Curated annotation (Swiss-Prot):
UniProt tissue specificity: Secreted in plasma.
Chief localization: secreted
Lineage: Eukaryota, Metazoa, Chordata, Craniata, Vertebrata
Signal peptide residue numbers: 1-24
Primary gene name: Gpx3
CDD domains in the cross-refs: GSH_Peroxidase
Annotated organism of origin: Mus musculus (Mouse)
UniProt name for this protein: Glutathione peroxidase 3
The entry's keywords: Oxidoreductase, Peroxidase, Secreted, Selenocysteine, Signal
Pfam families to which the protein is assigned, alphabetical: GSHPx (PF00255)
GO terms, molecular function: glutathione peroxidase activity; identical protein binding; selenium binding
Residues forming the catalytic site: U73
Enzyme Commission code(s) on record: 1.11.1.9
Length: 226
C-alpha cells in the first residue's frame, strides 16, 4: 500500500511538472531582477572577423537575444532554429547576437577564422550561414569573462542549482550565477535592461513564445501610454 501511495504521489508531481530533474531543479526560464543599475548599452564587442567593434547601444530600441554558442555541441543544431527565429521576429525588432566560447566541454576549439567554415561544412553543415551577428570567441564565465556577461548574469537568476561536472567546465572561480552550458540565452528589452534568461535545453520554440508574449505586453503598455 505504501508503495502504491508513493507511486501515486510521484505521478501527481510529475503531471504537475514539479519533479526535479536528476541534475537538480532546472527551470526553463527565469525572470531578471528589476533593480540593477546600468544597461547593456554601456558595453560592446568585436565581430568574429575582428574588424569591427560594435557598441550595443547600436541596438537601442530593439529586443536583443544574447546566446553563447559552440560548433561541436549536442545543441549546435539550435543554430538552425535561431536562424528561423531571427527571420521570423527580426521584422518585429528582435536582434540575435552569438558569442562563441570554449569553456563548456572544449566544444569551440577553433580559431575565430575557423568557426564560420565549421558551421557551413561540418555542423550544422549543408552550407549553413548564420543570419545573425557572431562575435569573437571569448569567456562568458570566470576571471576573464567579458564584462557584458558579468552584467547579464548579475541581472538574472541562474536557471539551475548545479553547475555540472567540473571536469567539463573550464573556468575559475566558479560562481552561482555562472552560465551552465552552451546555448544559454538572455533577452534584453528595448530599454537595455535584461528581462529573461533561459536554460540551455529550453527549446527555441519555447523561447520564441516567451519573447512574443513579452513583445505583446510591451506593445500593450505603449498603447496605454499613448
Amino acid at each position: 500500500m505504501a508503495r502504491i501511495l508513493r507511486a501515486s504521489c510521484l505521478l501527481s508531481l510529475l503531471l504537475a511538472g514539479f519533479v526535479p530533474p536528476g541534475r537538480g531543479q532546472e527551470k526553463s526560464k527565469t525572470d531578471c531582477h528589476g533593480g540593477m543599475s546600468g544597461t547593456i548599452y554601456e558595453y560592446g564587442a568585436l565581430t568574429i572577423d575582428g574588424e569591427e567593434y560594435i557598441p550595443f547601444k547600436q541596438y537601442a530600441g530593439k529586443y536583443i537575444l544574447f546566446v553563447n554558442v559552440a560548433s561541436y555541441u549536442g545543441l549546435t543544431d539550435q543554430y538552425l532554429e535561431l536562424n528561423a527565429l531571427q527571420e521570423e521576429l527580426g521584422p518585429f525588432g528582435l536582434v540575435i547576437l552569438g558569442f562563441p566560447s570554449n569553456q563548456f566541454g572544449k566544444q569551440e576549439p577553433g580559431e575565430n577564422s575557423e568557426i564560420l567554415p565549421s558551421l557551413k561544412y561540418v555542423r550544422p553543415g549543408g552550407g549553413f550561414v548564420p543570419n545573425f551577428q557572431l562575435f569573437e570567441k571569448g569567456d562568458v564565465n570566470g576571471e576573464k569573462e567579458q564584462k557584458f556577461y558579468t552584467f547579464l548574469k548579475n541581472s538574472c537568476p541562474p536557471t539551475a542549482e548545479l553547475l555540472g561536472s567540473p571536469g567539463r567546465l573550464f573556468w575559475e572561480p566558479m560562481k552561482i550565477h555562472d552560465i551552465r552550458w552552451n546555448f544559454e540565452k538572455f533577452l534584453v528589452g528595448p530599454d537595455g535592461i535584461p528581462v529573461m534568461r533561459w536554460y540551455h535545453r529550453t527549446t527555441v520554440s519555447n523561447v520564441k513564445m516567451d519573447i512574443l508574449s513579452y513583445m505583446r505586453r510591451q506593445a500593450a503598455l505603449s498603447a496605454r501610454g499613448k
